[in-house]
Amino acid sequence: MKTEDDEMEYEASKEETVSEDKDFDDGIDYRTVIKENIFTMWYKTSLHGEFATLNCVITPKDQNLLQHIFDEDIQTSEAPQTVVLQGAAGIGKTTLLKKAVLEWADGNLYQQFTHVFYLNGKEISQVKEKSFAQLISKHWPSSEGPIEQVLSKPSSLLFIIDSFDELDFSFEEPQFALCKDWTQISPVSFLISSLLRKVMLPESYLLVATRSTAWKRLVPLLQKPQRVKLSGLSKNARMDYIHHLLKDKAWATSAIYSLRMNWRLFHMCHVCHMCQMICAVLKGQVEKGGRVEETCKTSTALFTYYICSLFPRIPVGCVTLPNETLLRSLCKAAVEGIWTMKHVLYQQNLRKHELTREDILLFLDAKVLQQDTEYENCYMFTHLHVQEFFAALFYLLRENLEEQDYPSEPFENLYLLLESNHIHDPHLEQMKCFLFGLLNKDRVRQLEETFNLTISMEVREELLACLEGLEKDDSSLSQLRFQDLLHCIYETQDQEFITQALMYFQKIIVRVDEEPQLRIYSFCLKHCHTLKTMRLTARADLKNMLDTAEMCLEGAAVQVIHYWQDLFSVLHTNESLIEMDLYESRLDESLMKILNEELSHPKCKLQKLIFRAVDFLNGCQDFTFLASNKKVTHLDLKETDLGVNGLKTLCEALKCKGCKLRVLRLASCDLNVARCQKLSNALQTNRSLVFLNLSLNNLSNDGVKSLCEVLENPNSSLERLALASCGLTKAGCKVLSSALTKSKRLTHLCLSDNVLEDEGIKLLSHTLKHPQCTLQSLVLRSCSFTPIGSEHLSTALLHNRSLVHLDLGQNKLADNGVKLLCHSLQQPHCNLQELELMSCVLTSKACGDLASVLVNNSNLWSLDLGHNILDDAGLNILCDALRNPNCHVQRLGLENCGLTPGCCQDLLGILSNNKSVIQMNLMKNALDHESIKNLCKVLRSPTCKMEFLALDKKEILKKKIKKFLVDVRINNPHLVIGPECPNTESGCWWNYF
């Protein structure tokens, strides 16, 4: 179809149909033509042996879906004008759309539309310029009358755009360049963009089909789209279909289990003809004496068998083999298409990659490529996964890599490929897996024998170098990327490579939801010998893994337990592993038993164990390993119900001399008075524990009383105690105050979020005056006291010589309360070093008193005034003090202090002239672009002493600001700018506990 011919034809028809007054029929002729075209196309397809597949994907569920996609929304009472039909390659989108057109033509569907127009992305991409009327009139019969009259009533029209993902358009046209006139000849890309954006024919309806990978490119063009996903065969339907294809029920059950153990292959089976292909490969391998489980172990193994079967090595009647140059050209076309998400090879693509018609015929005969049945100058790989396989092979067949300083094309950059993940770059994921799988020596040997060539393995060393670089890039070490990476590394089935690949990773984050993931992680992680920290979320217990009859094969349960044993064996085989976090895991009796055995192993070197928010099934909590494991010093059970058995085994372990726990975190563990008393009894004989966090438990005054008995014990080793939000009141402060004077070791106490009031603060203040009080840090955040409490604390500070950290945040001290405190803080013998006054209802009036403290207290090095409305005037007062050479404050918190661009000069003064302030928090202030720009001009100087500056994440990510921050990072690399301070346990220094 040539553009020039179409234009001539259109001009001729235009002269014949100038009258808009002509009466024409209800579109029966057009409906007939449309039906004939679709049936002709289906007939051509059936000649290629694919007619069964076309019918297979049309299920009653899909037909029901078609009937309701334009129904009114129940809440808005509006019918969607734009619907997107989304699904994987080969799932049946095109078939479903053509079925919809046929149903309309037969009068069974969408009768609210007088005309339905079907537009295919493959065809549209080959057209350069036309009017929209020309574009849709290819099959318009003359008996219908002028198409212009039809287009004049857009609210009764439905436009179906098939294969949006194949449209080779950028869709970056500015709004003013779009076209409203459907008679105007324009670039076809402009026409389609205008239609999608509702500039042309805005009242019309759209039904757009696309692969999932193109959704992000499509959605910005649409107005209020409704998305409908085609899911293909369900899990049960897949299993039934595999049974049907393999006939032999016993063998089919084994195949299903093997396929389900490889979630990639099992997922591929949701597309009918992929399921057929996979089962055909399994049949072929079994007939040759192969084992189903070995063929299914990796997706690369199965596809290598399949690709090699397309080029049989027989002397008579064999398919002509492509030479290495031809194979490389095909692979390059494949990889370029995968990266750009373009899966149709047009004439220009063939010329670009130097593929002749004879070359194409070779791959057509081998069933690697197929010719489009409608558009004869379009070629595609027989399936997306076949294209992905050849795309991966490209990286093994590249030549002259040493002559390139930089990759000439983005798709040649292996580092970019490894950086990708299945959420943001789903189109690259399977190709990446195939690439790693092709490092396997058996796969390479198969391909070398099939294609009679030698494959270089230089890419192996390239990948290892990229993995090393990936580990050094902190932004790449997300759970998402690492899990993707493990799936890829597993494909190699090469223990030596896996060991080399994982030697760069000291910290990993993985999640196990299903048995296939467990198999992969258990295989890979035991080869990660440099691993120091492992965060594992185990959500799949044994019962859930064996949830179907097909899975319950003989020995399956034993195999699953073996995988868990393999995974947790790293606790004793990896001597560098010192921390394990089982955050949000579900642990049953079997897993708890395995864990206990591994943690009790004499070679276990683990020091820190975290069971945060863990769900122990059927009360299987068991911490008996603590009695014999002398290495574990840190146990965190936050947000985990200890249960009866958990508390019992924990208390028994704490009583044992072999238990060496130093840190125990039991925040939000559903502890009450009775449980607290049992814990306190166990602690009476414990000599190792130095940190205990019991926050967010309803201990009340009685529970705290039993803890005070522990503190009064001269043999107690407790140094830090956190009792935030434990129901403590002023009545409990009396017994606590008494214990504080008798405790010889306690240095840190957190009582935040308890209603102590002024009376409770008075009792604690009396204790602070006592010479025997050893407290160094006291956290009284949100304890409901007033300036009266401040006065008590102020008096205590005049006598106390040990306290260096005081947190009074979220109490209504007001300016008067702070004034009382400042009187004591300015005294030369006051040893306080860190003062937290967040959300204390302070104003600029308090800044004068605070400024005096900054000048007169040489010990104070950290002051947090966040969430107080100090305004620019308050900062101005503080800045005068900060410029004083006697001021030694290093850390200054000014988050949400009502600062505006008017304070910019004062901030610049702090950054330029103050030599002590090295950390500052400016988040949640109304600093504009110009203010941050000016700050960056000072921060970029290598002489700037600032080490950390906290700014809002949304500000940091703004394009206008980003370039200034990059400049700062280049010129002043020791400075960190971000919303969180690095290298601190809590993540932010202003959050102490």
Swiss-Prot record:
Q: Which GO terms describe its biological process?
A: cell differentiation; spermatogenesis
- Domain NACHT spans what residues? 81-403
Superkingdom of the organism of origin = Eukaryota
Each LRR repeat, start to end: 636-657, 660-680, 688-708, 717-738, 745-765, 774-795, 802-822, 831-852, 859-879
* Tissue expression profile of the protein: Detected in adult ovary and testis. Detected in oocytes and in germ cell elements in seminiferous tubules in adult testis (at protein level).
Supply one GO CC term from the record. cytoplasm
Keyword Cytoplasm on this protein? yes
Report the SMART domains cross-referenced here. LRR_RI (SM00368)
What the entry lists under InterPro entries is as follows: Leu-rich_rpt, LRR_dom_sf, NACHT_NTPase, NLRP_HD2, NLRP_innate_immun_reg, NOD1/2_WH, P-loop_NTPase
Keywords carried by this UniProt record: ATP-binding, Cytoplasm, Developmental protein, Differentiation, Leucine-rich repeat, Nucleotide-binding, Repeat, Spermatogenesis
Is RNA-binding included in the keywords of this UniProt record? Answer: no
Q: Which PROSITE patterns match?
A: NACHT
Annotated GO molecular function terms are:
ATP binding
Which is a Pfam family this sequence falls into? NACHT
Compartments, as annotated in UniProt: Cytoplasm
Q: Which residues are noted in the entry as ATP-binding?
A: G87, A88, A89, G90, I91, G92, K93, T94
The similarity comment for this entry is: Belongs to the NLRP family.
Q: What does this protein do?
A: May be involved in inflammation and spermatogenesis.
Mind telling me what this protein is named?
Answer: NACHT, LRR and PYD domains-containing protein 14
Source species taxonomy: Eukaryota, Metazoa, Chordata, Craniata, Vertebrata
Q: Source gene?
A: Nlrp14
